[in-house]
Amino acid sequence: MAKFNWDKLLHTSWLYTKIFFAVLALCVASYVYGTYKPNESAISKVNEELDIFYMNEIKAMDLQEPEFTYNNDIQFVRAMHKCINFINFTLPKDKRVPYEMIIGQAALESAWGQSRFAKEANNLFGIRTWNKDTPHLLPQGVTKWRGWGVKSFASKCDSVQYYVDLLNNHSAYKEFRELRQKMIDKNQMLDALQLIKKLDKFSTTKDYDARVARMI
């Protein structure tokens, strides 16, 4: 009968023990690294969950739309700021539109809130409707429906909300959304002047982006 080799057994056991603890150490290190130094995907997921929680909390507060009153250009800008702040409370960060862009376009389209459509229809952006049954105004001098009208809103802040929704959802502004997302992914501030260039579908005016930019 062969003699049992205890030395070989002890050597093999010690080798496997070292391997076990080495693997265990790697697992612990990986766990610690992943816990205290999460990757970008983990950070993004946490931020997304926080945004959802934050949005739900804000909605539960049932905030009321701010009053939109003004007598001059400065007051118009202040009223716009209050309205945009109110809208942003209910929007995730990646769905927001720069203040300068919204105010610049509203100022251009509504003559700083002094246009007929702004005063009578609360429409600050000249947004149209092609549905005759939708509340609307016809252009000055037009008495019959010609296939479109300027949409009427319950309030001026309501028209701002509609404008933001339009940029966030309409297929015509896909390039705007893509550029905004690129800026967000690079942790850059949203560049209103660059984003305005993606509004070419909003108006048939060739230099529309330049006109909006001059209002900023």
Could you say what each language-model-derived stretch is?
Residues 2-103, 108, 112-216:
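Catalytic cores of secreted/periplasmic lytic hydrolases that degrade extracellular macromolecules
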